[in-house]
C-alpha cells in the first residue's frame, strides 16, 4: 500500500473554480486497500493558499473525512517554509523510504521542505507530479497555459533538479478525463464512501 502526502491547490466547492484536484484526492480515498492519504498539504495555483485550505477542509468535512489532516502552506510571494513544509519533513523522518509525495499544484511546499532539510529527497520513496506539457494544450478550441510548474517556476526547477524517483503526468495526459453517464458512475463509484459522495454530487 502506498502512503501518500497529497499536495494540491484544490478549489472544489468555490463557485466557478475547478474541481479536478478534488477528483484526484477522492480517487485515492476511494481505494483504501491501495493507498493511504496521510494528509492534504495546501498550496496556491487554482486559488490562494488560504482559499485552497478552506475549500479542502470544508470538502473533507462535508464528505465525512474531517479526521484527515489539512495543512496550510505558504502564500504566493512568501517564503516557502511553512507548516506544510515542516509537516513533510517530519513525516519523512518518521518513515524514511516509505512515503510518496503526490503534487498536483505548485511545488512550493516540497521546495520549502527541502530548504529545511535537503535530505528529504533521499527519504521520499517517490515523487509523482502533474505539470508541464509535451504538445499544445487545447481545450474546447482554446490554448491553455502550463498548469502547475509555471505557478512557482523556482520551486519547480529546484525539485526537478534535486528530487529523485520523479514521475510526471503532463497536462496532455490529464486534460481530457473520461466521464461516465451519471447512472453508470454511481454504480461504479457507489461501493465506498468517497465514491458515493462524488456520485451524489
Which residue stretches match the model-derived regions?
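N-terminal acidic, glycine/proline-rich low-complexity segments
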Residues: 1-201
Amino acid at each position: 500500500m502506498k502512503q501518500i502526502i497529497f499536495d494540491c491547490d484544490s478549489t472544489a466547492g468555490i463557485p466557478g473554480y475547478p474541481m479536478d484536484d478534488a477528483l484526484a484526492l477522492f480517487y485515492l480515498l476511494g481505494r483504501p486497500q491501495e493507498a493511504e492519504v496521510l494528509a492534504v498539504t495546501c498550496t496556491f495555483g487554482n486559488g490562494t493558499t488560504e482559499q485552497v485550505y478552506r475549500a479542502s477542509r470544508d470538502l473533507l468535512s462535508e464528505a465525512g473525512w474531517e479526521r484527515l489532516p489539512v495543512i496550510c502552506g505558504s502564500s504566493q510571494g512568501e517564503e516557502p517554509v511553512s507548516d506544510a513544509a515542516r509537516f513533510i519533513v517530519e513525516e519523512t523522518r518518521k518513515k524514511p523510504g516509505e512515503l510518496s509525495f503526490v503534487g498536483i499544484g505548485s511545488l512550493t511546499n516540497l521546495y520549502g521542505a527541502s530548504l529545511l532539510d535537503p535530505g528529504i529527497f533521499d527519504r521520499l520513496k517517490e515523487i509523482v507530479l502533474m505539470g508541464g506539457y509535451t504538445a499544445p494544450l487545447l481545450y474546447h478550441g482554446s490554448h491553455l497555459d502550463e498548469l502547475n510548474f509555471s505557478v512557482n517556476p523556482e520551486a519547480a526547477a529546484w525539485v526537478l533538479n534535486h528530487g529523485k524517483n520523479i514521475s510526471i503526468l503532463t497536462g496532455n495526459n490529464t486534460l481530457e478525463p473520461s466521464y461516465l453517464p451519471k447512472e453508470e458512475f454511481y454504480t461504479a463509484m457507489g461501493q465506498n464512501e468517497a465514491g458515493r459522495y462524488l456520485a451524489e454530487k
